[in-house]
Amino acid sequence: MPQRSPAQSVPALRPLPRNNRTESYLESLQILERLHRLMLDLVKDEFERLGRSDLTPVQAMLIYNLGTAEVTAGELRSRGMYQGSNVSYNLKKLVELGYVHHERCDMDRRSVRVRLTQQGQEVRDCVAELFCRHAEGLELSGVLDDPPVEAVNLQWRRVERFWAEQIRYIY
């Protein structure tokens, strides 16, 4: 079989048909990704300001989302408390650092339940205070009014539901 040049081995991609709605949706996806990264940067900056360098922003968000719940590692993902792929690693680190307590379930010894320690609650409170300050600033500036943030959240929940249905359909 003759060798192909790199240009021949990859079929040319034809442009997808796009309309204004598609373009707006794609822009929303880019904004959403940037917002997530900026949120992590804000958490990182807050912890640097407080002189706390032991946690990554992802770990701080895991602590924040865990809150007062006591769940298994699997439930962290299924309940939307953690979106990453390395939940076991981050939980292990948080246990080692003293932010999360873990214990085996009585009913199923393979399963581990996790909850925040007092030190973890303090981190959660730090992140909550940061987000409250941001919400107050956004409220005062009027950013949350047009369109109302509640309507924006409703729209994002609809997108979330659509995506979840797409994933269920695949499997």
Segment roles from a protein language model:
Residues 42-86:
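N-terminal helix-turn-helix DNA-binding core of bacterial DNA-binding proteins
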